[in-house]
Amino acid sequence: MAGDAERARPVPPPSSGFSTPPPDRAPAPGGAGGVPHQDAVHPWLASYPPGVDWGALPVPATLPEMLRHAVARFGERPCLDFFGRGWTYAQLGAQVDRAAEGFRRLGVRKGTHVGLCMPNCPFYVISYFAVLKAGGVVVNFNPLHMPMELSAQARASDTRIMVVLDLEPMLERVLGLLRRPGREDGPLRHVVACRFAGALPALKGIGFRLARRASIGTVPRHDPQVTLFDTLLEAPPLGDGPAITPGDVAVLQFTGGTTGRPKGAVLTHANLTANLEQVRCWFHECREGEERLLAVLPFFHVFAMTVALNAGLAWGAEIVLLPRYDQASFRTALRRKPPTLLPGVPTLFKAILDAGTPRAMLSSVRFCISGGAPLPLEVKHDFEAASGCVLVEGYGLTEASPVCFCNPLVGENRAGSIGLPLPGVEAEIRALDDPGRALLPGERGELCVRGPNVMQGYWGEPEETARVLLPDGFLRTGDVGIMAPDGYVTLVDRIKDIILCSGFNVYPRAIEEALYTHPDVAAATVLGMPDPYRGESPAAFVQPRPGASLTMEDLHAFLAERLSPIERPRLIELREELPRTAVGKLSKTELRQELRERHPRGGA
């Protein structure tokens, strides 16, 4: 957690990125020019890639500072592209400045919580940095959430102002959260509505309005609680804005954490700028001012917010915005603006494969990073073979801003492993029954991390904060893993997902990996179901490839040759689609509830 000493440190331009390591930290052999050696405390040093210094610490900074330096360095370079309409860095900077004044006119002060409920679009980017420059705190909302979910998060986060697109049902749901006469319990005080068609090129904007009238909501006119985004840009200057420090809160990012109940992770400017610099340091082969990044993952998800938005702008990349993934829009973007960088989640790379995307369409892509969920070995191998680009698996969690581990771009890109700790990140495997006790390499336990990117805690949740943030500063991730003697970490499963079967620990990921080796399996997820004899047994839900003639009997026979008897699923069900989160990750929540309802007491 950021302390007063850290907040008092000088803040040079983010282009410098890292400070020299303090005396009590061992320098990494790659960037520091040392000879790789084995370190009992930091075994990953022996494997660290050349040119990357683990011992260097990110210099605390603020996100508006980062943007200001990016605008100064890359002013006339293309910054954003939205279906053919472009913004330069200078244009983005100017609109952020004007919108920040508008938010201040609306009453945003230092610490005011402002919700962003939008897919990827220019309004999100402008609002994100404008709220931060005005001193506010960004609270990301999933625009696909139902009214009850939006209301619960708005109340839990003390969100008072919400920015939303004028598309239905998004707009109606957010307007329904306003506190009005007869609805005094509404959590919101003000809504800022953005005209989606206004972000499109002129002809496309007209076409959208004509073709999609049913999708365009009605923004109330002359309503003192509703402001058009365009009006924000017309606000006259109010003078100097608030002083923002690295230790100030920047984002409340909601997560299920390790318990499944949504909680707001408190992320400071120092946390988020540290993580974007850690990512930039790891991907130091990226060419500043020359890259083009395809942003198909939603910015309201912390992985995309850090890797695609924050790091993308710090790199001086052109960011091509897609509001959602569909194969037609994706292929159009590949042809029109060939990307060099593609962050994604496993299901995105799987979808690209399943759609038969031609290798030539991916020829411009140099690096892909997969996060958000474990990357199946088959997906990694097949995607690299089909695309010709490097796909590295990383790992992170919302509570760490989020990226903590990644496989090297140069050196061993170890399949099945989340890689090595990023610069400044310390990692230990702790005993499952005693999170204060570190284990030796090769032993299985809970992965714990410590570093400048780790959150300050959960908003309004002191007990939950104390449960996951240990007294020595390490964060409990809730993931079971093994650290090899050379520092590479392999995750076995989530602690909450381990299936206790006849007294044995059964790991769903091992069963899922076996299922993915079947040529007719498109997606698979495994979880525990009540069993009157064993306590729990594995249950597998499988989505076949389109056109495949797959049967449950086929899969039972297939797994019988690959899994031990106790690992073999008692139940296998085929589904046309499996539940997914907003970023395309497979979700076990709905299936777990379904199994509880079908087998309330462990019956057959």
Predicted features along the sequence, with ranges:
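Structural core segment of the AMP-binding/adenylate-forming
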Residues: 2-32, 105-106, 133-231, 546-548
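Adenylate-forming
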Residues: 164-175, 197-199, 297, 325-326, ...
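Conserved adenylate-forming
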Residues: 103-112, 236-247, 252-295, 315-317, ...
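AMP-binding/adenylate-forming catalytic core of the ANL superfamily
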Residues: 145, 152, 166-167, 342, ...
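Conserved AMP-binding/adenylation subdomain of ANL enzymes
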Residues: 273-292, 300-341, 355
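Conserved AMP-binding/adenylate-forming core of the ANL superfamily
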Residues: 57-59, 68, 76-121, 125-129, ...
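Short beta-strand->loop structural element characteristic of the AMP-binding/adenylate-forming
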Residues: 115-117, 124, 128, 132-165, ...
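Conserved AMP-binding/adenylate-forming
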Residues: 291, 317, 367-368, 375-394, ...
